[in-house]
Design a protein with these regions (language model features):
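N-terminal auxiliary segments of SAM/dcSAM-dependent transferases
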Residues: 1-142
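Conserved alpha-helix/loop element of class I SAM-dependent methyltransferases that forms part
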Residues: 145-149, 163-179
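Conserved class I S-adenosyl-L-methionine
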Residues: 177-188
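Conserved beta-strand positions in the Rossmann-like core of class I SAM-dependent methyltransferases
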Residues: 181, 201-204
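Conserved SAM-binding loop of SAM-dependent methyltransferases across substrates and taxa
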Residues: 187-199
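Conserved acidic E/D residue at the C-terminus of a beta-strand in Rossmann-like folds
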Residues: 204-210
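S-adenosyl-L-methionine
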Residues: 210-252, 260-261
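C-terminal substrate-binding/active-site "lid" region of AdoMet-derived donor-dependent transferases
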Residues: 259-362
Length: 362
């Protein structure tokens, strides 16, 4: 792997940006994990008596929680990332209005109402990738309790119809048309929303969990206005797609088989290859985050080459799927030459990374 002086300088800048991306992502993940929320009285005191905005008050409380002082880059990662959400935007959603379930237990699964406390932080949308591949989180909060439908298996929450779910599916809902194949059932939000579209004629859902299918059919599907469009097949989604012929009647595919970008990695790589084979427009839940995750790995390989002096022997063993992917990326790139900042920047674009995953053995 060779770098011109200009390309090397840019790669070193990207290594620093990658570190910031990871640090702020880890910060928010910790806040989400502990369901960190600020005491409403504390926030109100900061706002009413000290002139803080709700956003500034939350930022102050985060600094206090971690015992840190945010640096200059926090304007992008915190100030511009935080947004007060309006509950009416979500309560007026057609699915939310139609599916009025407070508590249903069926076998080991339970449909219930989860909630965010006032000023509790959550990911409201997929990340936004800015210039030079800065990954800006999209973080929301409500100023009063906000309830949403969720599904748990025994005591573990499995999926939720929270603002993140609604916002991250908007693009796919807009693009779906004709005969649609949906990989993964979940709470049926995506099928419900596209079933309302006149240009969506038929919806086939692939879900391998028979208990989730039964729960959906018994409690959620009866609330669909266009039940006649819905067909559910119990099968493994990857196996089903791999058996499809090029002349399949599907016009569009939407894949939602993972909980996060790490969980998605292998499934996504398999599916983008199938997308190319079938030549069917396909969208993937959290695709921006998935590609950003792969971009981080590529930049990690740059770090190894430019700073640590790694060689082929450092990319042989793999303890995790991420390690395996990094190894594959290294061997796919080891003979490449980067001659300019522009070339390197284009190589790290979403389209370029997707082509790399399709064409190389990663």
């Amino acid at each position: 792997m060779k770098f011109s002086k200009e390309a090397k300088e840019y790669a070193l800048d990207l290594i620093n940006i990658r570190e910031n991306n990871i640090n702020y992502n880890d910060m928010y993940c910790e806040l989400f994990y502990y369901r960190f929320c600020n005491e409403k009285d504390d926030i109100n005191d900061l706002m009413l008596n000290q002139g803080y905005t709700s956003k500034d008050a939350i930022k102050y409380k985060i600094e206090d929680f971690f015992e840190i002082a945010f640096e200059e880059e926090s304007e992008i990662y915190v100030d511009e990332a935080l947004r007060e959400e309006k509950e009416d935007e979500y309560l007026s959603n057609p699915y939310v209005k139609a599916i009025n379930i407070s508590h249903v237990k069926q076998g080991k699964y339970t449909l219930f109402k989860d909630k965010y406390e006032p000023f509790e932080l959550f990911a409201r949308d997929d990340i936004k990738v800015l210039d030079n591949y800065i990954e800006q989180p999209q973080i929301g909060y409500f100023t009063k309790p906000f309830s949403f439908l969720a599904l748990k298996e025994r005591d573990v929450t499995w999926m939720s119809l929270n603002p993140n779910e609604i916002n991250t599916m908007k693009k796919g809902i807009e693009r779906a048309s004709g005969n649609v194949l949906v990989l993964g059932l979940g709470l049926g939000y995506f099928p419900f929303m596209i079933s309302l579209k006149d240009d969506v004629k038929d919806i086939t859902i692939i879900e391998r969990n028979k208990d989730v299918i039964a729960l959906f059919k018994d409690n959620i599907l009866p609330n669909f206005k266009h039940k006649e469009k819905i067909h559910i097949i119990q099968d493994d989604a990857i196996r089903y797609v791999q058996k499809l012929q090029k002349d399949t009647s599907f016009d569009y595919i939407f894949a939602d088989l993972w909980h996060n970008q790490e969980d998605a990695l292998r499934l996504y790589i398999t599916l983008v290859k199938e997308e190319r084979r079938l030549n069917i427009p396909t969208d993937y839940w959290l695709e921006t985050s998935i590609l950003a995750y792969v971009r981080r790995m590529i930049i990690f390989v740059f770090l190894g080459q430019l700073i640590e002096g790694t060689s082929d022997m450092d990319y042989v063993e793999a303890a995790t799927i991420e390690d395996s992917c990094i190894n594959g990326l290294y061997f796919a790139m080891k003979d490449m030459e980067f001659t300019s900042k522009k070339q390197l920047k284009e190589f790290l674009s979403d389209a370029s990374i997707k082509e790399l995953l399709i064409n190389e053995k990663i």
